[in-house]
C-alpha cells in the first residue's frame, strides 16, 4: 500500500537502518514537505494515497539524506 502512514513507517525504518538520528522527525519533515502539508496532518490524513510522483520525490530526499551508494529504487519499496 502507498498510503501516508505506510510510507511514513517504511521511511522511518529505512532511516533507522541507515543510522539517522531522529528518524521519525526526519521522515515526517520530508513527507510533509513533499505533500505540502503540516506534519500533524500526516496522521490526520494517514489513509491518503500517494502518487508515484510523490513517492519518487520522497525516495530522492531520503537518498539525499542517507547519501548512500545503495539508492532506494522504485522497486524496493523503501526497504
Tell where the protein language model's regions lie, with residue ranges:
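Conserved AdoMet
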Residues: 32-79
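Non-catalytic accessory regions of SAM-dependent methyltransferases
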Residues: 1-50
Amino acid at each position: 500500500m502507498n498510503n501516508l502512514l505506510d510510507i511514513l513507517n517504511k521511511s522511518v525504518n529505512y532511516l533507522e537502518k541507515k543510522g539517522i538520528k531522529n528518524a521519525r522527525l526526519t521522515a515526517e519533515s520530508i513527507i510533509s514537505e513533499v505533500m505540502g502539508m503540516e506534519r500533524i496532518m500526516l496522521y490526520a490524513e494517514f489513509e491518503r494515497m500517494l502518487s508515484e510522483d510523490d513517492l519518487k520525490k520522497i525516495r530522492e530526499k531520503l537518498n539525499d539524506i542517507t547519501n548512500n551508494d545503495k539508492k532506494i529504487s522504485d522497486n524496493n519499496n523503501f526497504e
